[in-house]
């Protein structure tokens, strides 16, 4: 009996995986199914399932492949995918490694267009206030391909309409995977410069794939963030891109964009000529009207007889002067009458007896005051003589007149022999004069 061979789980799984990988029909398969268990992982691989009414298969889409998907996959969306079938040893299940995906029934680009359109509309990018296009620009920036017909059409149109404006080309890719970033970068660059008035972005017609860079979110965000007004001219008139919806103004063609960005110089000159003519006519009319007013004034009675202008005022002054003089006389007469009345009342109310009594009282008071003053002066004189006698008795001169003297040395009074030295010069002061002396001896009396 043959002995059974037991395989490990890994060995069996690897064997089955090799079968999957060796099958040429599984190297490239195309599936239609409904997305299930999808949760968007930012900047990472995507894991989900595809199912129909009867079956379900796990799917993985690596980050590099998912970056090429133009729309946003959603739960329950029916899609068409392509990829290879293989087995994942970790759980022993087979799965499809998806390398491309597009919506079933609707183009992937159209689906992406509608999704981004809804997203930006909800954010308010389409309804935001549009910047006005400068009427008389000095410098216009153009973002387009340097080799396309767009730049030639714009230059031709602007040269014909408004040759004094300066056009500056900012070359950008307008087709391909790098075009959107190229366009957005140039818009941002222009906004760092201070001397531009308007931006024109555009390219010629083409398929939706050709025009797709102008449907990218990065371009829409750059246009919305622009501090300068943006005119979009992408494709033909029937083509409407996301850039057209966000831009401040949309033009059907590059020529139309140039016309929207510039006035016609000849029209401006004609308008200036009209304004000049209107100004001249208006000035002449004003001058004529003022001349007629001057003539009318010259013919008026004020200029013919200027004294009539102030005759009424002179008459009023005379009348007012007479009224003032009359009023002054009246006030003086009234004042004199009032004075006489008051004087009569005063005379009538002053009895002679009261006046006489008052005079006697005043005279009596005067005599009493004189007597008091005389008595006080006599007392003060006696007191003064007594004080003088006392002071005279105590006066040094009075004492010196009785034979006493006082000694000074260097104008200082000598009070003791201790203040003197041999040969000191001293002065003897008498009541009627002085004498000088020199100390020869000093005798001290013992106490």
Swiss-Prot record:
It is found in: Cytoplasm. Keywords: Cytoplasm, Exonuclease, Hydrolase, Nuclease. Its EC number is 3.1.11.6. It catalyses: Exonucleolytic cleavage in either 5'- to 3'- or 3'- to 5'-direction to yield nucleoside 5'-phosphates. It is an enzyme of class 3 (hydrolase). The keyword Ribonucleoprotein does not apply. GO terms for cellular component: cytoplasm; exodeoxyribonuclease VII complex. One of its GO terms (molecular function) is exodeoxyribonuclease VII activity. GO terms for biological process: DNA catabolic process. InterPro entries: Exonuc_VII_L, Exonuc_VII_lsu_C, OB-fold_nuc-bd_dom. It comes from the Bacteria. Heterooligomer composed of large and small subunits. Bidirectionally degrades single-stranded DNA into large acid-insoluble oligonucleotides, which are then degraded further into small acid-soluble oligonucleotides. Belongs to the XseA family. This is Exodeoxyribonuclease 7 large subunit. It comes from Pediococcus pentosaceus (strain ATCC 25745 / CCUG 21536 / LMG 10740 / 183-1w).
């Amino acid at each position: 009996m043959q002995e059974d061979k037991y395989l490990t789980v890994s060995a069996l799984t690897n064997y089955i995986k090799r079968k999957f990988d060796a099958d040429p029909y599984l190297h490239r398969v195309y599936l239609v199914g409904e997305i299930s268990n999808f949760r968007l992982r930012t900047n990472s691989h995507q894991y989900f399932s595809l199912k129909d009414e009867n079956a379900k298969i796990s799917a993985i889409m690596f980050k590099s492949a998912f970056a090429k998907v133009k729309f946003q996959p959603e739960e329950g969306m029916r899609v068409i995918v392509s990829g290879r079938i293989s087995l994942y040893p970790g759980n022993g299940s087979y799965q499809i490694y998806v390398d491309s995906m597009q919506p079933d029934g609707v183009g992937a680009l159209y689906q992406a267009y509608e999704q981004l359109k809804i997203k930006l509309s909800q954010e308010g990018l389409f309804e935001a206030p549009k910047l006005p296009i400068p009427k008389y620009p000095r410098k216009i920036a153009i973002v387009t391909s340097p080799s396309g017909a767009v730049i030639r059409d714009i230059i031709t149109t602007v040269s014909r309409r408004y040759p004094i404006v300066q056009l500056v080309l900012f070359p950008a890719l307008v087709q391909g995977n790098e075009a959107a970033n190229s366009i957005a970068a140039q818009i941002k660059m222009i906004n760092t410069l201070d001397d531009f008035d308007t931006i024109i972005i555009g390219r010629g017609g083409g398929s939706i794939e050709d025009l797709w860079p102008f449907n990218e979110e990065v371009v829409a965000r750059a246009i919305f963030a622009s501090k300068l007004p943006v005119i979009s001219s992408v494709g033909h008139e029937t083509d409407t891109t996301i850039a057209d919806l966000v831009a401040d103004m949309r033009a059907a063609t590059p020529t139309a964009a140039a016309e929207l960005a510039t006035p016609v110089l000849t029209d401006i000159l004609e308008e200036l000529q009209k304004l000049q003519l209107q100004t001249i006519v208006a000035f002449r009319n004003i001058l004529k009207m003022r001349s007629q007013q001057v003539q009318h004034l010259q013919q008026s009675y004020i200029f013919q007889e200027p004294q009539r202008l102030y005759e009424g005022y002179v008459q009023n002054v005379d009348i007012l002067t007479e009224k003032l003089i009359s009023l002054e006389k009246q006030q003086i007469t009234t004042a004199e009458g009032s004075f006489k009345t008051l004087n009569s009342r005063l005379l009538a109310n002053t009895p002679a007896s009261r006046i006489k009594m008052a005079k006697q009282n005043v005279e009596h008071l005067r005599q009493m005051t004189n007597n008091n003053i005389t008595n006080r002066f006599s007392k003060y004189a006696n007191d003064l003589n007594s004080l003088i006698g006392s002071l005279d008795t105590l006066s040094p001169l009075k004492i010196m007149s009785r034979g006493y003297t006082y000694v000074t040395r260097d104008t200082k009074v000598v009070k003791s022999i201790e203040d003197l030295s041999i040969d000191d010069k001293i002065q003897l002061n008498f009541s009627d004069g002085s004498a000088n002396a020199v100390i020869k001896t000093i005798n001290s009396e013992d106490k």
